[in-house]
């Protein structure tokens, strides 16, 4: 089989304006970025009936460190839906440069299930992430300038919660001291960087309905606390208008295409632990108004991205998911059955019998939201027929549809069975979130911990209790909860693979994201600034005299 980049370069792309024309998007709402990429004005959304299409959410079982192929599945499913006569659009998050140059490489699908032009999407794209980083750091700069010139807002230097941001993996920037070198440079204090995808600005961009909503949300950001314990907002700094100006183009969804010319909206890229982990609401709603089926993807497993999509994104955007596709692999099932990473290519039926309990939990979790489930079993060359049969038979006995997905190797042809099974259940959804937003914070977390993470109880640290009291005092405790925890276990401990239960779920602290509109409950150590490995993917990336890029895949 050809490499991903060889497959991508052999594809025959349609001019992006043709893709837009086929979707009936008027030229007045388009801004072309070269021949194969364009931005669609967010104002076009006002012309659409967003109830037209059905929304398909692609999630996964608890992944291995390598991931299980959600993006490839999402792209393949959308192409297959088009192949069998339905208009479909896939909506995805934008790749971050940090992982591109780090361990992961490119993030535009793979094999015969890719979004293109791959090099452009992975490297800068249309500049959205750069705009987010610039907006984020303008706030940081104004905070320290405000303090330097009198600190009229009486900001407590020890309680500034707004870090700086950069779209790169750089562990040396996690914890730093700024403003060294004398009084002219400001007041020295501890600070740090997060990767841009973890910025609250990114979450706001993906949750905003329009520029005015974005401006209001930015103004509501709490950047820290005053010496008398009151929240200090961006609105008090007076720069929400400037931030909106920086993001005026970034708020517009990006239009590209798959390897088979299926339309793809790629817009925004918030983390699925510290934030909600799905592409922009504007892109999803626009796609719903232009197609029969919209395929969108949530980050990590169903305990993280899907739960947040159901409990937070859907109510916030008035979305009604029709189907959830849970991506599973034989290797991930064996991994949760106790098989080391180095041995995952070896047949092991006993490990599958044990590890499939993890998949069962994810199926049960999604069904608690009254959304029908289809399992997409991504097929790998090392999977044996006995292993595949065991997984299929076990899932079918649960009363859940399952499809062998071969979109990576066969494109849309490899996902037609999956598409048909999704359509079969698409009218059965009776979607409902699992908790009410106006419930107490502790109650919301206990529901998630016991129902989704399978804990027996919840423990709050002293720091968490203090932080929550501060949030309650500010009158912001009625916001929904985003739980930041490990993606490698349904529990709060990454070493607990499979189907752990009966444990105490620990909440270490709370973080207020009032601009985005949620409270983050932090469990365990959450890495917001990754580091590069000993041999990062950057050493594989190169460009020749003709401009051909190598090493992204």
From Swiss-Prot:
UniProt key word Hydrolase: no
This protein's name: Formate--tetrahydrofolate ligase
Family that this chain belongs to: Belongs to the formate--tetrahydrofolate ligase family.
GO MF entries: ATP binding; formate-tetrahydrofolate ligase activity
Pathway linked to the protein: One-carbon metabolism; tetrahydrofolate interconversion
Amino acids binding ATP: 64-71
Protein's UniProt keywords contain Cell division: no
InterPro entries associated with the record: Formate_THF_ligase, Formate_THF_ligase_CS, P-loop_NTPase
Organism from which the protein derives: Pseudothermotoga lettingae (strain ATCC BAA-301 / DSM 14385 / NBRC 107922 / TMO)
NCBIfam families: PRK13505.1 (NF010030)
Listed EC numbers: 6.3.4.3
GO BP, sorted A to Z: tetrahydrofolate interconversion
Catalytic reaction(s) noted: (6S)-5,6,7,8-tetrahydrofolate + formate + ATP = (6R)-10-formyltetrahydrofolate + ADP + phosphate
Keyword line: ATP-binding, Ligase, Nucleotide-binding, One-carbon metabolism
Encoding gene, per UniProt annotation: fhs
